[in-house]
């Protein structure tokens, strides 16, 4: 599993107010397992509800483009190689989309369908400071623009939280 620059001290400590200690991955398989083992555990967990050999591995908890590029590449490629994989979904922060990461995401996008989920939560910098997000709306927009330019085939999902204190 990855961590987050808003946890390890790069831009903050303790994370955003809405993230748990597991980085909002409370229902995900244990991150110490291999990617393959996590996919298989997830399939078992969902088997009662959905019967399918197709999977979209979801890198959810914390910031999944934040880490050593070779480790990220190995994790993404292991997921892509899993039998029945029809795409990959990667949740992260817009301020965790540096040049090496964008190049890697372009590689992933050339191999399979890619969705990148970006946590915005609020476009208000005042609210962002209150919830401890650790980056500005302008930084978010810069990250989205860079992602769209570099990986045009990727779907982008933006997470927002309606009704945050002080917003209407």
What do these predicted regions represent?
Residues 82-88, 153-158:
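Short, surface-exposed connector motifs at secondary-structure boundaries
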Residues 22-39, 46-69, 83-97, 113-140:
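Core AdoMet radical
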Residues 69-77, 98-107:
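Distinct, well-ordered alpha-helical segments
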Residues 125, 147-168:
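Conserved strand-turn element in the central/C-terminal portion of the radical SAM core barrel
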